[in-house]
């Protein structure tokens, strides 16, 4: 880990069907904080990001899932992979480090209900 904390890219997923997402980079992330604390931190930060369109700022995000870990293979999915949910969706009570988050990890942040709907019928609308 970097001395000042880790750099983590969070992909805000607004729509799975329309592949509508925006990446946000967080520097100095404490990997020993809980997933729940990081979710609160991101949700508090999103409305203040000038570069984000309004629909991203007002969306209800509640779930983090690992998309890519450093030195690992990337998925072919354009938004987020639909496999390995048990391993890759971060449990709110554990720490980021315990969940497998490291420096330069890429996470997806989305509404769990929308993810389940898309997973049941993974059809893109564009």
From Swiss-Prot:
Matching entries from PANTHER family are given as: UPF0538 FAMILY MEMBER, UPF0538 PROTEIN C2ORF76
Q: Which domain of life is it from?
A: Eukaryota
Task: Report the sequence similarity comment from the record.
Answer: Belongs to the UPF0538 family.
Name under which the protein is recorded: UPF0538 protein C2orf76 homolog
């Amino acid at each position: 880990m970097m001395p000042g904390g880790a750099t983590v890219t969070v992909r805000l997923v607004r729509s799975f069907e329309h592949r509508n997402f925006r990446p946000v980079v967080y520097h100095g992330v404490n990997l020993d904080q809980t997933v729940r604390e990081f979710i609160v931190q991101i949700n508090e930060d999103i409305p203040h990001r000038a570069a984000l369109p309004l629909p991203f700022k007002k969306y209800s995000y509640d779930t983090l899932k690992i998309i890519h870990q450093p030195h690992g293979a990337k998925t072919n999915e354009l938004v987020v992979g639909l496999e390995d949910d048990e391993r890759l969706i971060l449990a709110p009570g554990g720490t980021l480090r315990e969940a497998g988050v490291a420096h330069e990890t890429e996470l997806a942040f989305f509404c769990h209900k929308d993810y389940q709907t898309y997973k049941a019928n993974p059809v893109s609308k564009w």
